């Protein structure tokens, strides 16, 4: 019987490539462009976020993504230091990682990931 524990999520480093497959027993989200696994549904924090190009989900952890350099951006909720994230398989920009929030009320986002809905699809066990 396959294990449902894929282990810890890899660190988001721009110099390494990670190739992870999430167990079929988990509902997952995948890249709509290449179907690389991106996140388990269990890692979803909120569906109420806005990305650069539409609605987005906030995740606690993701797999198979790379990070660009961090930069400061003024977002709807204030100034943040963020790094764009991209699919390691097809290199499509998916959203961003919150590196630092400058307002106390936004600190919960630090280390979390935004993936835009237009770049992901539901996979495994959603029936």
From Swiss-Prot:
It holds the Pfam family Yippee-Mis18. GO terms for biological process: negative regulation of erythrocyte clearance; negative regulation of erythrocyte differentiation; protein localization to plasma membrane; regulation of cell shape. It is found in: Nucleus, Nucleolus. Its main location: nucleus. GO terms for molecular function: metal ion binding. Keywords: Metal-binding, Nucleus, Phosphoprotein, Zinc. Detected in brain, spleen and testis. Residues 27-124 form the Yippee domain. Zn(2+) binds at residues 31, 34, 87, 90. The modification Phosphothreonine is found at residues 92-93. The keyword Zinc applies. One of its GO terms (cellular component) is nucleolus. The modification Phosphotyrosine is found at residue 98. Signal peptide: none annotated. Belongs to the yippee family. This is Protein yippee-like 4. It comes from Mus musculus. The gene is Ypel4.
